[in-house]
């Protein structure tokens, strides 16, 4: 065997170091490989960094329970309406019955539906929070998701709380037909009443936020925050290109593209999200306990003016 044949054999039997790293088996979840930069990170370090890659800043998807733990102060979370569960009014069946799909997804994820709602404290400030979970049928918005979010917003309006909804969804749930689509208007109506009460609403757009969620409550915030490099849009890129027969620009439907064109107000890293939300709420919140309703202020001003006139009349006498 010549030296050239020997080297050729070694190249076939032993892949390069980079290839070995890519194909390395990650045993028992001890290490996690970044899907963006392929760097291997100790899983506990990744979790301590809120599932943000320490090498490239890639944001991994986060389960709703973990997101709640990241945002809410410890032992302050109180779930709302967690007893609501989806039904199958249309007896819908695609590859399998919708009722079976619900049960299978509930067993797999441990969730009742694609959103968790509740109240708690964020850096000591009261907050009504909704967190969508993409693991549950792609975070799709059905009747239960719409009802839970609507009740959350109505409760926040009644109790004068700011609302934050963390969005992660493929859109409306097709298995529920019109019952799913009507949730867009239903939630939007609840948010309008919340806005009329001069209360703060902030949606946080994560990867991905698409479809009917984008077309409704995801874009109705007083301030709209997005995570870095999140896919945000209505229809998919391929669908738009095939419909328009045009090539879309690079980076289209990313949070950076939307920020550049004025559709979102800020891109905030997950590691800074709690701090940022708390600061925004603290800026907005003090105006409500300090300032009474407008009609009360007007009465107070009128009464104060009368007192001044009486005192001036007394001095003149």
UniProtKB/Swiss-Prot annotation:
Component of the acetyl coenzyme A carboxylase (ACC) complex. Biotin carboxylase (BC) catalyzes the carboxylation of biotin on its carrier protein (BCCP) and then the CO(2) group is transferred by the transcarboxylase to acetyl-CoA to form malonyl-CoA. Zn(2+) binds at residues 34, 37, 53, 56. The keyword NAD does not apply. It is an enzyme of class 2 (transferase). It comes from the Bacteria. Residues 30-299 form the CoA carboxyltransferase N-terminal domain. It catalyses: N(6)-carboxybiotinyl-L-lysyl-[protein] + acetyl-CoA = N(6)-biotinyl-L-lysyl-[protein] + malonyl-CoA. Its cofactor is Zn(2+). Keywords: ATP-binding, Cytoplasm, Fatty acid biosynthesis, Fatty acid metabolism, Lipid biosynthesis, Lipid metabolism, Metal-binding, Nucleotide-binding, Transferase, Zinc, Zinc-finger. Belongs to the AccD/PCCB family. PROSITE patterns: COA_CT_NTER. This is Acetyl-coenzyme A carboxylase carboxyl transferase subunit beta. Binds 1 zinc ion per subunit. One of its GO terms (biological process) is fatty acid biosynthetic process. One of its GO terms (molecular function) is ATP binding. Its main location: cytoplasm. It holds the Pfam family Zn_ribbon_ACC. It is found in: Cytoplasm. A zinc finger (C4-type) spans 34-56. Signal peptide: none annotated. Acetyl-CoA carboxylase is a heterohexamer composed of biotin carboxyl carrier protein (AccB), biotin carboxylase (AccC) and two subunits each of ACCase subunit alpha (AccA) and ACCase subunit beta (AccD). One of its GO terms (cellular component) is acetyl-CoA carboxylase complex. Its EC number is 2.1.3.15. The lineage of its organism: Bacteria, Bacillati, Cyanobacteriota, Cyanophyceae, Oscillatoriophycideae. Pathway: Lipid metabolism; malonyl-CoA biosynthesis; malonyl-CoA from acetyl-CoA: step 1/1. It comes from Crocosphaera subtropica (strain ATCC 51142 / BH68).
């Amino acid at each position: 065997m010549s030296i050239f044949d020997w080297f050729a054999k070694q190249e076939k039997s032993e892949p390069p170091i980079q290839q070995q790293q890519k194909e390395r088996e990650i045993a028992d979840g001890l290490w996690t490989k970044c899907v963006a930069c392929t760097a291997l990170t100790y899983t506990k370090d990744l979790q301590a960094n809120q599932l943000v890659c320490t090498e490239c800043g890639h944001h991994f998807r986060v389960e709703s329970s973990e997101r709640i733990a990241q945002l809410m102060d410890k032992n302050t979370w109180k779930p709302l309406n967690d007893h609501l569960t989806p039904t199958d009014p249309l007896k819908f069946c695609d590859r399998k019955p919708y009722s079976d799909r619900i049960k299978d997804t509930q067993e797999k994820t441990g969730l009742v539906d694609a959103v968790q709602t509740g109240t708690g404290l964020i850096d000591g400030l009261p907050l009504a929070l909704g967190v969508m979970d993409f693991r549950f049928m792609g975070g799709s918005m059905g009747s239960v998701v719409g009802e839970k979010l609507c009740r959350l917003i109505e409760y926040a309006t009644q109790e004068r709380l700011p609302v934050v909804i963390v969005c992660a969804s493929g859109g409306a749930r097709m298995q529920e037909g019109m019952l799913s689509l009507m949730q867009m208007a239903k939630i939007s109506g609840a948010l309008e009443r919340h806005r009329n009460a001069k209360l703060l609403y902030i949606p946080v757009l994560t990867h991905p936020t698409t479809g009917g969620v984008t077309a409704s409550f995801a874009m109705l915030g007083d301030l709209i925050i997005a995570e870095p490099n999140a896919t945000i849009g209505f229809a998919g890129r391929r669908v738009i290109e095939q419909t328009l027969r045009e090539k879309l620009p690079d980076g289209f439907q990313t949070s950076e593209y939307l920020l550049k064109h004025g559709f979102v107000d800020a891109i905030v890293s997950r590691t800074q999200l709690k701090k940022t939300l708390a600061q925004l709420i603290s800026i907005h919140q003090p105006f409500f306990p300090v300032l009474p309703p407008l009609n009360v202020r007007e009465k107070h001003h009128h009464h104060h003016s009368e007192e001044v006139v009486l005192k001036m009349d007394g001095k003149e006498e």
